[in-house]
Amino acid sequence: MDGRNEKPTTPVSDFRVGSSEQSQAGVNLEDSSDHRTSNSAESKKGNLSGKSISDLGISNNDNKNVRFTADTDALENDLSSRSTETSDNSKGTDGQDEEDRPARHKRKPKVSFTHLRNNGKDGDDETFIKKIINNLTGNQGGLVPGLAPIPSENENGKNDIEKNNRNEEIPLSDLADASKIVDVHEGDDKEKLEALKLEGDVNCTSDGETLGSSSKNSFLAPAVDHFDDYAENNSSDDNEGFIETSTYVPPPSQVKSGVLGSLLKLYQNEDQNSSSIFSDSQAVTTDDEGISSTAGNKDVPVAKRSRLQNLKGKAKKGRMPRLKKRLKTEAKITVHIADILQRHRFILRMCRALMMYGAPTHRLEEYMVMTSRVLEIDGQFCIFQVV
């Protein structure tokens, strides 16, 4: 009986010891004073944790560090696995980029002006910017004249042309155009050829003036007031900045009459000459009739007959100076028209030169107005920029 009672006691003590040891593994260090109580709920947790740890093959001596070491190892394993995955991914992307680089480089189009110009889609889809690019890259020089690309082979030829142009003399007057204008309005008259023979002061011209002097009051007209004529005292706030007292040229009081006014004078002279010739012809006919009548009468004395013949000769001589005067006025009108045309050509040539070498376009009109005032020409100018 005693042996039977002793046998079950040993496992009970062992159980208590095991429970106490297992409970110590599950209890915090601060509660070490109460670790002998084996009937608490913490002992149950210790038993469960002990079973789970024993199942994993971990001894009871390492129970205190099992929970913490397991967590840190898991974190380190996760971080290492992630780093390896990212490194693998980065290597894969780098390899893919290296493989795709030549292909993408080949597929990338070259964006240039020639690509935009020669794409073969010049239709309604063409935008304003594309038109500007086409004009800038064209062979016509774009918006600025004279900037067309010149091949190297033709540069020497261009230099030769420029040298030849420098050596050429610019004629001060050209009567061909003026004579054509006068011929159109004059008619078929053989005596008009003598109009080109310049007489007296017409032949004597200085270096500073063209054929025809500006001192003749017959070819001057009063200046017309235009909207762009600025008074010298009115250059305050309303005028633009480029109009200054040093560059301002006041309009002249008298200007040279234009081509139309000269042609009107030509017609006026023809009317006066025709009327004078008609009156002279009537006078000559009456004188002829009187001479013929007197010649028929034998009773007329010889002195009276000679006087009538002298009157007939004076009438013929009076007709010749009037014809010379008419030819002289026609010559003056021709020279005046040639002078006006020459000044027009000079203004246009100067405007083209300024546009060619980069003068500001918003000031060209003002420059032309000032030049026309200096040349005593009444002119208005409007510049159209070709885009």
Swiss-Prot record:
Annotated region (Disordered), positions in chain: 1-126, 138-169, 275-298
Domain of life, source organism: Eukaryota
InterPro entries: ThrE-like_N, ThrE/Ser_Exporter
A Pfam family assignment: ThrE
Ranges of compositional bias, category Polar residues: 49-63, 78-93, 275-296
GO molecular-function terms, A-Z: transmembrane transporter activity
Amino acid composition bias (Basic and acidic residues), ranges on this chain: 32-45, 155-169
Additional notes on this entry: Present with 1480 molecules/cell in log phase SD medium.
Protein family per UniProt: Belongs to the ThrE exporter (TC 2.A.79) family.
Protein name stated in the entry: Uncharacterized protein YJL107C
Organism: Saccharomyces cerevisiae (strain ATCC 204508 / S288c)
